[in-house]
Every structure is written in C-alpha cells, then in structure tokens.
Amino acid sequence: MTIYFINWVADYELKMIQYLKKKYKIKNITTPKKYNWINKKISKIGMDNAWLGRLFIKHYLNDIKKDDIIIINDSVVNKGINKQILKNINCHKVLLLRNTVGEDFILDNANYFDIIYDFEHRFIGNEKIKAIEQFFPIGMDEIRNYSLSDKNNSQPICFFLGRDKGRLQIINELAERLTTLGCKLDFNVVKDKTSSTTSKYLIEKQISYEENIRRTLNANIIVDITKENQSGWTLRILEALFFNKKLITNNINVFGSEIYSESRFFIIGHDDWDKLEYFINSSVKPMDYDSLYKFSPDKMMSTIVSDFIDK
C-alpha cells in the first residue's frame, strides 16, 4: 500500500510528511503550475476539463493501485484540478479536515471520497464521516529532540502568530493586560483583508514554521484566539501540549475536555481576569506520552491505514 499526499504544500505539512516517510511508503505529489494555468483558461470558456485530470494521472500517478490511498486536505480540495484527479482515479480517497468547515462543504465534496475525517466531530451522522483527533505535525520520535523544560526568562514571554481575521482588537486588548502584568510580548499578526487599524503587532508576511517553533520554544505562554464557531483544537493548542507551554485561549470547549488543566489553560470568557497574574507565574507539568500520542501524526496515519486494511 502506497499513500499519496496530493498538494500538501505548507512547510509544516511537508515536515510531517518527511517524518511519516520513515514509517510508511509515501509519495508527496504536487500539481505542476502549468496544469492549473491550463485549467483556469479552459474553465473560463466552459470547456470540459476532465481530460486534464486524466493527463495528470497518466504522467504522475500512473503506477497507483486500487488499494493505495490518496489524501487531500480541505484547503486544496476545491482548487486546481484536484476534483478532476479524484473523478478519474481508482483507489481509496481520503479528505482530511484541518479547518472548520460548514455542512455545505461536506455535501459538495462527499461523493469524491471514501472517508472524510473530521477533527471537530460535528458531522458524524454522515455515513462518509469518521472522527479523528486534530494532529500535530511533529512526530513522537521527533518531539524528544526539543527542549521541553520551563523557560527561565527574566520576563514571561507571550507568543502569538496568526492572520488578522478580524481578531486584532481582541489581541490588542489582551496585549495591554499582559504588558501591565510584566509580560514581554512576541505578537505577530499577519495583515489580511480584515486589517483596517494600525497596530505595532501587524506584520506583512507569515513567518516559516521552523521560526514559529523557535519562538514557541522560547516563550512561556502561547496565545490562541479562534473563530466563534470553532470547537476543535488548533495547531496552537497542540503546540502548548507537545512543547509543554501554557496557553491563553478563547476556545471555551477546552474547559472540561480531556486536555484541560487549570495550570495550562487560561480561558477568556470563562476565567476571571483577576486570576491571570497567578496563571502567568505558575508552572505546568508535561503531558504523558499516551496522552500526546492521540494527537500525533503517528496516530493519524495509523488510523487511516487501519480503516482501509480492515475493509
């Protein structure tokens, strides 16, 4: 069985795939730009583009077998010629949700896949849907290479990285509270179409995932501000668990979950602001191996492979 990751291009995704290649027979295939360029041109004139998917399969996926697995994520499934590839290939097909999506998204894409894995566990009534935990891109064999001891910084360092997405006001307000309590801020809000106000925390471009890891490891506290309808765990939450950091978040679903501990999480909208200073200055214990494994790429890949072997 060969596992094909199709158009996974983010740097943290590539890091994960390289790790998984040590354990599984995996190929990472990216659609050449010329295919997407041609697809745009012929789509504008209403020309059928199924042939383009077949041509790509002939040149790049010609050796695929029916018991192999294609894995596509929600960020790319509706882009380029991915749908044409899925229509014209005979193998197991998986859609792996990494972001919050609506029911319409599921309905539009369900027929292209054998299984859709949902980390928020919101669509379990659909026969194509299976629950899976959100997963961290760094594997269990690699996490031990990082220093997970408490950072003895002269000032507690709070780290935020993410696109604006209309969150700048909340971030600015939190920054004021943290500064008042003596924290040093490493806040990086990437400008997007929602950015209308000026802020010293705005940056023009996203930083690399390796740099993100470096800053995360250097921090004492990570900040995670999510959309109102998001219920699953973000990458920031998983960073806090795997790198043994404290986390300030507005994700109320953390409270009462299996990952919750009062020493690790300060939940905006649940915890009193009066408790923030104590939280900042408290320590937190690392999670055990078995608890982390549930959110690892090792577990994710094992789950997917097992689901098809058992069929």
Curated annotation (Swiss-Prot):
Key words of the record: Lipopolysaccharide biosynthesis
Domain of life, source organism: Bacteria
Function: Probably involved in the biosynthesis of the core oligosaccharide region of lipopolysaccharide (LPS). May be necessary for the attachment of a rhamnose to the LPS core by a linkage to the KdoII residue. May also play a role in a lipooligosaccharide (LOS) biosynthesis pathway.
Pathway: Bacterial outer membrane biogenesis; LPS core biosynthesis; Bacterial outer membrane biogenesis; LOS core biosynthesis
Cellular component GO terms, alphabetical: plasma membrane
Disulfide bond among keywords: no
Coiled coil found in the keyword field: no
KO phenotype (gene knockout): Truncated protein interacts with other waa/rfa components and inhibits completion of the lipopolysaccharide outer core. Mutation of the gene results in changes in the LPS core but does not affect the attachment of O antigen in an E.coli strain producing the O antigen from S.dysenteriae.
Gene Ontology biological-process annotations: lipopolysaccharide core region biosynthetic process
Listed name of the protein: Lipopolysaccharide core biosynthesis protein WaaS
Disulfide bonds: none
The organism of origin for this protein: Escherichia coli (strain K12)
Organism placement in taxonomy: Bacteria, Pseudomonadati, Pseudomonadota, Gammaproteobacteria, Enterobacterales
